[in-house]
C-alpha cells in the first residue's frame, strides 16, 4: 500500500509505503499503518490538520495491489507498489501493475545503453524507470 500527501511540506516525508508478502500480507500491512493511530487522543484523531502534518498514511492518494510475481522471482523487492523517488515532487512515481511485459529484455537493454543501471529486473520496475526517464528529460 502506498499513500501520498498532496500538501506535504518541504523537509517532511509525503510518500509512504508498506509492503509484505505471504498469506497474511494484507493484515500485516494494515496493522503497521494503523499502529500510527493507536496512541492518539480522540481530539487528535478528529483533527484533519494534525493528521495531515503528523501522521503517515493520512493522505489524499492511495494505491495498493495484490500481485504474484509473473517472472518466477520472489521477495519483498518484487512486491507492489514500486516507488521512484525524486526531490522534485512532480517527478515522484508510484506504480502497481497487473501486466506481464514481453519485451523487458529490450527495454532493459535500451535503458542501460542510455546510462541507467536499474536495481531490479522486473517488468513493473522497468516500466517505472522508463516513465521516470521520460520525466527526467
Write out the residue ranges for each language-model feature.
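Conserved short alpha-helical segments that host acidic/polar catalytic motifs at enzyme active sites
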Residues: 1-137
Amino acid at each position: 500500500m502506498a499513500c501520498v500527501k498532496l500538501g506535504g511540506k518541504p523537509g517532511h516525508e509525503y510518500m509512504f509505503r508498506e509492503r509484505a508478502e505471504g498469506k497474511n500480507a494484507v493484515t500485516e500491512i494494515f496493522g503497521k499503518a494503523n499502529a500510527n493511530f493507536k496512541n492518539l487522543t480522540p481530539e487528535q484523531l478528529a483533527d484533519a490538520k494534525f493528521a495531515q502534518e503528523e501522521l503517515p498514511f493520512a493522505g489524499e492518494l492511495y494505491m495498493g495491489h495484490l500481485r504474484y510475481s509473473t517472472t518466477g522471482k520472489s521477495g519483498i523487492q518484487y512486491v507492489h507498489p514500486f516507488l521512484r523517488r525524486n526531490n522534485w515532487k512532480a517527478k515522484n512515481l508510484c506504480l502497481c501493475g497487473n501486466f506481464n511485459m514481453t519485451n523487458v529484455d529490450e527495454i532493459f537493454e535500451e535503458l542501460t545503453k542510455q546510462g541507467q543501471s536499474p536495481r531490479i529486473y522486473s517488468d513493473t520496475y522497468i516500466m517505472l524507470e522508463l516513465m521516470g526517464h521520460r520525466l527526467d528529460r
